[in-house]
């Protein structure tokens, strides 16, 4: 499993905080950030890498998280969530089988961002009754 991470200019600093944290937790990180990327381009790059392997997860950071979320939800087979708290990050894995989260550097601080990332990457899909909704989401794109 790889954690694919990316950010636009507004999310660069927080991306490095999250990246360093996850590397210290022994996760394999793939950073697809390129200088001057818009949130649209970085979200597409993260999604492309996430979709290469079933187990891969993605994190995109910009100023507010809304833009990358909108982009991610346009991608076939991508279930994504915009999160700004630990519980939502964990639960979106458990109930929605989300493979990508977005967050805003203007909304969350360093410690919260690390906790959000930790909740997301440690969350496990519960399946069962939740699969009905996941199937519905996947049919939409």
Swiss-Prot record:
GO terms of molecular function: galactose-6-phosphate isomerase activity; ribose-5-phosphate isomerase activity
Pfam families named in the record: LacAB_rpiB (PF02502)
SUPFAM superfamilies named in the record: Ribose/Galactose isomerase RpiB/AlsB (SSF89623)
Transmembrane segments: none
Catalytic activity: aldehydo-D-galactose 6-phosphate = keto-D-tagatose 6-phosphate
Keyword tRNA-binding (UniProt): no
Listed EC numbers: 5.3.1.26
GTP-binding as UniProt keyword: no
Assembly and interaction partners: Heteromultimeric protein consisting of LacA and LacB.
Family per record: Belongs to the LacAB/RpiB family.
Official protein name in the record: Galactose-6-phosphate isomerase subunit LacA
Organism whose genome encodes this protein: Streptococcus pneumoniae (strain P1031)
Gene, per the UniProt record: lacA
